[in-house]
Amino acid sequence: MSVDNNQRDLEAGIHTDLQGRLTYGGYLRLDQLLSAQQPLSSPPHHDEMLFIIQHQTSELWLKLLGHELRAAIGFLQRDEVWQCRKVLARSKQVLRQLTEQWSVLETLTPSEYMGFRDVLGPSSGFQSLQYRYIEFLLGNKNAQMLQVFEHDPAGQAQLRTVLEAPSLYEEFLKYLARFGHAVPAVYEAHDWTQPHVADDALQPVFERIYQDTDRYWREYALCEDLVDLETAFQLWRFRHMRTVMRVIGFKRGTGGSSGVGFLAKALELTFFPELFQVRTSLQAAPPAEQA
């Protein structure tokens, strides 16, 4: 099909009288959203707009990720496995989007960044409340992080709430216990503010599931969803570190951290350690007995 005059005419049914009615821009509050990019460099450095939008869009995706992970926890609490799997699948795609987004910031050269870096002062992505919130939801609890938000009592209170509640993984362990798996009783109630660390007592639970996936398919599928989620998150962390290395090398971060070295340490953190350890300890299932 060709358009002779290279113009697409409005169809008769398209709404054009929008006075006083809900519009696309009104629904999305684009007047507020698109006026939030305010470069501080003077005169405005061309590439500061990229830097601002990169981080603002990341925060929007993080908001959605937190929304989905809270839903996943709720579904687990109600034993709604398929609904939980759906939002975990969406969460993985959000993380993929966040990871690929670094390729845009990678177009920022070191000299371009140095042209406006000074105006950032001590501000840093390290201070992202939503990032810490998601880490806590996934089990990387660290009460020290609350200190970073002393300037924001409301945000600090929000972070404290998730610090003191069971993480996604802890809710998964409680789900397994409800369905007859030998999860130690300590996971029913303990100090939720502590990060989860690898527990040898959980290994038999996951070996049982992985050795008989037909029998425990729901549990196995959820395990693999969590493995996908952690892998996606770690890829995002890795891409972040490499982007920072590419743009600033080994300079200190604006927030006072060692920069790349500090980001690299995050790659050593894990959310669901037993789900990776079981791959080492797993043995072939014994052959079925012949009748």
From Swiss-Prot:
<dbReference type="GO" id="GO:0019442">
    <property type="term" value="P:L-tryptophan catabolic process to acetyl-CoA"/>
</dbReference>
<keyword id="KW-0479">Metal-binding</keyword>
<keyword id="KW-0408">Iron</keyword>
<feature type="binding site">
    <location>
        <position position="117"/>
    </location>
    <ligand>
        <name>substrate</name>
    </ligand>
</feature>
<feature type="binding site" description="axial binding residue">
    <location>
        <position position="240"/>
    </location>
    <ligand>
        <name>heme</name>
    </ligand>
</feature>
<dbReference type="GO" id="GO:0019441">
    <property type="term" value="P:L-tryptophan catabolic process to kynurenine"/>
</dbReference>
<dbReference type="Pfam" id="PF03301">
    <property type="entry name" value="Trp_dioxygenase"/>
</dbReference>
<comment type="subunit">
    <text>Homotetramer.</text>
</comment>
<keyword id="KW-0223">Dioxygenase</keyword>
<keyword id="KW-0823">Tryptophan catabolism</keyword>
<feature type="binding site">
    <location>
        <position position="113"/>
    </location>
    <ligand>
        <name>substrate</name>
    </ligand>
</feature>
<dbReference type="InterPro" id="IPR037217">
    <property type="entry name" value="Trp/Indoleamine_2_3_dOase-like"/>
</dbReference>
<dbReference type="InterPro" id="IPR004981">
    <property type="entry name" value="Trp_2_3_dOase"/>
</dbReference>
<comment type="function">
    <text>Heme-dependent dioxygenase that catalyzes the oxidative cleavage of the L-tryptophan (L-Trp) pyrrole ring and converts L-tryptophan to N-formyl-L-kynurenine. Catalyzes the oxidative cleavage of the indole moiety.</text>
</comment>
<comment type="similarity">
    <text>Belongs to the tryptophan 2,3-dioxygenase family.</text>
</comment>
<dbReference type="GO" id="GO:0046872">
    <property type="term" value="F:metal ion binding"/>
</dbReference>
<keyword id="KW-0349">Heme</keyword>
<feature type="binding site">
    <location>
        <position position="254"/>
    </location>
    <ligand>
        <name>substrate</name>
    </ligand>
</feature>
<feature type="binding site">
    <location>
        <begin position="51"/>
        <end position="55"/>
    </location>
    <ligand>
        <name>substrate</name>
    </ligand>
</feature>
<comment type="pathway">
    <text>Amino-acid degradation; L-tryptophan degradation via kynurenine pathway; L-kynurenine from L-tryptophan: step 1/2.</text>
</comment>
<protein>
    <recommendedName>
        <fullName>Tryptophan 2,3-dioxygenase</fullName>
        <ecNumber>1.13.11.11</ecNumber>
    </recommendedName>
</protein>
<keyword id="KW-0560">Oxidoreductase</keyword>
<dbReference type="GO" id="GO:0004833">
    <property type="term" value="F:tryptophan 2,3-dioxygenase activity"/>
</dbReference>
<dbReference type="GO" id="GO:0020037">
    <property type="term" value="F:heme binding"/>
</dbReference>
